[in-house]
């Protein structure tokens, strides 16, 4: 079992694409400064309130509903953690410890490929990730190309399918030949590369 997931999650050391010659969009200085501002109680509590508290607890034993329910009691310590992270850019190593659990993708799963690994992460780590994601949401649409249709708020993966459909229809109407390439990305989000 370890070998199967080791192969899945290990970099084979093969060729990697180069980013030379790519022209990236940039954010301005004011937006960059806002990304680096100190965390406020409002930022943290808003992110915490938006999170689903019904998820399984992580290695720390606390679910998000604990942090939501106990906010008034724990906010000083939580904000101390955020202040420390902001000032030093790091946290204790154990904070992002996970429990890896295998969940069957279908009934009667026997082969390891029939299982999906789920990471149970601690609540503070999830909260930090959410606060950082909320900040990035404000600028990500400016730096991610408009042709990227997923993972950016307001854009839909269905737009890519619609554009592909229109391109094929246009080629057929003009009686042009072409090549259609469909990529199987079944494991795209399970890989570290």
Where are these regions (language model features)?
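A short alpha-helix capping/helix-loop junction motif
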Residues: 96-97, 141-149
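Residues immediately flanking
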Residues: 59, 104-106, 123-124, 136, ...
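Conserved catalytic palm subdomain of right-hand nucleotidyl-transferase polymerases, strongest
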Residues: 55-62, 94, 111-120, 161-193
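Conserved short loop/turn motifs at secondary-structure junctions
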Residues: 62-70, 148-155, 182-188
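Conserved pre-motif C helix in the palm subdomain of viral-like polymerases
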Residues: 113-144, 162
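Phosphate/oxyanion-binding active-site loops and adjacent basic polyanion-contact surfaces
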Residues: 156-160
């Amino acid at each position: 079992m370890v070998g199967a997931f080791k192969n899945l999650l290990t970099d084979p050391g093969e060729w990697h694409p180069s980013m030379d010659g790519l022209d990236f969009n940039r954010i301005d200085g004011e937006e960059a400064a806002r990304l680096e501002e100190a965390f406020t109680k409002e930022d943290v509590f808003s992110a915490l309130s938006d999170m689903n508290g019904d998820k399984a607890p992580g290695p720390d034993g606390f679910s998000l509903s604990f942090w939501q329910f106990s906010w008034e009691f724990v906010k000083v310590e939580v904000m101390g953690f955020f202040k420390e992270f902001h000032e030093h850019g790091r946290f204790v190593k154990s904070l992002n410890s996970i429990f890896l659990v295998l969940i069957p993708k279908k009934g009667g799963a026997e082969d390891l490929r029939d299982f999906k690994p789920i990471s149970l992460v601690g609540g503070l780590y999830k909260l930090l990730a959410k606060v950082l994601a909320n900040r990035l949401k404000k600028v990500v649409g400016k730096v991610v190309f408009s042709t990227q249709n997923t993972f950016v708020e307001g854009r839909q993966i269905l737009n890519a399918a619609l554009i592909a459909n229109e391109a094929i229809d246009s080629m057929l109407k003009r009686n042009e030949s072409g090549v259609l390439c469909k990529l199987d990305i079944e494991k795209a989000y399970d890989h570290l590369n």
